[in-house]
Design a protein with these regions (language model features):
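Active-site histidine-anchored catalytic micro-motif
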Residues: 1-135
Length: 135
């Protein structure tokens, strides 16, 4: 499968955001694609992919805090027996993928943007995929 990359992460926190931008940059270089798109995909129902600010670590903290306020980890009204309903809601809100434009061998991101793998039900070993398409 040309230009499909699989990556593994060992997540040791219950809820966290891992910057995966450099990994994706390396995939683009390895692919040799100069113009096209890159899709970053998370195949898990309690994790997601987002693009957000990279300059202030407080942004990551605040995102996790905000998701926890919206979808608390502990809620006696949840019915899902595994106890991770909050993580399913957070990942559904976050989304499972992001698509970016590749131009001149680099993807286009805003000045303060990076790509994050978002874990809401750790600790776990996780995978994500990067698909690079020329054109």
């Amino acid at each position: 499968m040309g230009n499909l990359f699989k990556h593994s992460l060992s997540i040791r926190s219950r809820q966290t955001m891992v910057d995966i931008t450099k990994i994706i940059e390396e995939d683009i270089i390895q692919s040799g694609v100069k113009d096209g798109i890159v899709v970053v995909y998370c195949p898990h129902t309690t994790a997601g992919i987002t693009i957000n600010e990279n300059a202030a670590p407080d942004v990551v903290h605040d995102l996790i805090y905000g998701f926890e306020k919206a979808y608390p980890t502990e809620d006696k009204n949840y019915r899902h027996f595994e106890g991770n309903s909050h993580a399913h809601m957070k990942s559904s809100t976050m989304g499972a993928s992001q698509t970016l434009i590749i131009s001149e061998g680099k993807f286009i991101l805003g000045r303060w943007q990076d790509i994050y793998f978002c874990e809401f039900d750790g600790s776990r070993n996780r995978n994500f995929f990067v698909k690079i398409i020329s054109g």
